[in-house]
Amino acid sequence: MTSTLRVAFAGTPEFAQIALAALHQAGLPIVAVLSQPDRPAGRGMHLQASPVKQYAVSHGLGPVLQPPSLRRTGKYPQEAAAAIDALSAQQPDVMVVAAYGLILPQEVLDLPRFGCINIHGSLLPRWRGAAPIHRAIEAGDAETGITLMQMDAGLDTGDMIAMEHVPIGLTDTTGTLHDTLAALGGRMVVEALARLAQDGSLPATPQPAEGVTYAEKIAKEEAALDWSRQSAALLRQVHAFNPFPGASAELDGVSIKFWQAEALPDRPADAQPGAVLAADADGVVIACGAGALRVTQLQKPGGKRLPAREFLQGLPIRPGQRFASRA
């Protein structure tokens, strides 16, 4: 696809990198890339570039701009001003935004001729905010999707350009759904920019006033399981927090992460929530407030994710032991 549109891109994690790659591979001219500053990561805590920056640098896209803020009146006014001036110098027609992580002030929203288009991983107005994929799985939603939105100054409140639905399967995790939605978002935004280049505009519909929910950022503390809850709810938590931060519970002072599981409808009437009912090659069965959870993939501190059979060889768990509940 050849296009006369000059496209700027703003994004940081892998979800955004997949969209940037789709735009680049479609032949759209990427005239500027914004991404969050390099962060310490890994065991050595060395500075690491974001997936978006890595893709942009390796494919010669840019300039790459990494201001800590885009607010001229904020904590980093000089860095913000320099980035906005550099972006303006590229004269973008449109900016695509995906999981950028910084607030775009009105000045930046107004800078491209056709404004800024956001790729959001939910069916707006449900799950506005930072963690829409996690929250959709955790809540037991039957479906989610991608919404393309004409950005305004609110938090994911802009008019909707396009929407596509994706069912949430019984075994879907945030990781699997992330990959599906990221690829879908890339395809959708490429198609939208093709329409924009052809027609000179993109019709958009205001979001419904009803059905607004917010997807708060995931806190590590949420990973600890509360065994008084129903097994189906705990299974959703395991799926929602895979791959980050990982659902977990303590057993005799050792924090164990749970990566794969299945909900069982029944448990002995006298079983205490958190009690281990069985531990064998098929999994570790733990009593819940209602039903039980069979955990089939586990991880101990400093170890790898392992199927139950291998995990139990290194860290035996026996019926009668009891996992602690989140305080």
Curated annotation (Swiss-Prot):
UniProt GO cellular component terms: cytosol
Binding residues for (6S)-5,6,7,8-tetrahydrofolate: 122-125
Reactions catalysed according to its record: L-methionyl-tRNA(fMet) + (6R)-10-formyltetrahydrofolate = N-formyl-L-methionyl-tRNA(fMet) + (6S)-5,6,7,8-tetrahydrofolate + H(+)
EC code: 2.1.2.9
Enzyme class: transferase
Domain of life: Bacteria
CDD domains xref list: FMT_core_Met-tRNA-FMT_N, Met_tRNA_FMT_C
Keywords: Protein biosynthesis, Transferase
Cited InterPro entries: Fmt, Formyl_trans_C, Formyl_trans_C_sf, Formyl_transf_N, Formyl_transf_N_sf, Formyl_transferase-like_C_sf, GART_AS, Met-tRNA-FMT_C
GO-annotated molecular function: methionyl-tRNA formyltransferase activity
Any Pfam family the entry gives: Formyl_trans_C
TM region positions: none
Record function comment: Attaches a formyl group to the free amino group of methionyl-tRNA(fMet). The formyl group appears to play a dual role in the initiator identity of N-formylmethionyl-tRNA by promoting its recognition by IF2 and preventing the misappropriation of this tRNA by the elongation apparatus.
Sequence similarity: Belongs to the Fmt family.
Protein name: Methionyl-tRNA formyltransferase
Organism: Ralstonia nicotianae (strain ATCC BAA-1114 / GMI1000) (Ralstonia solanacearum)
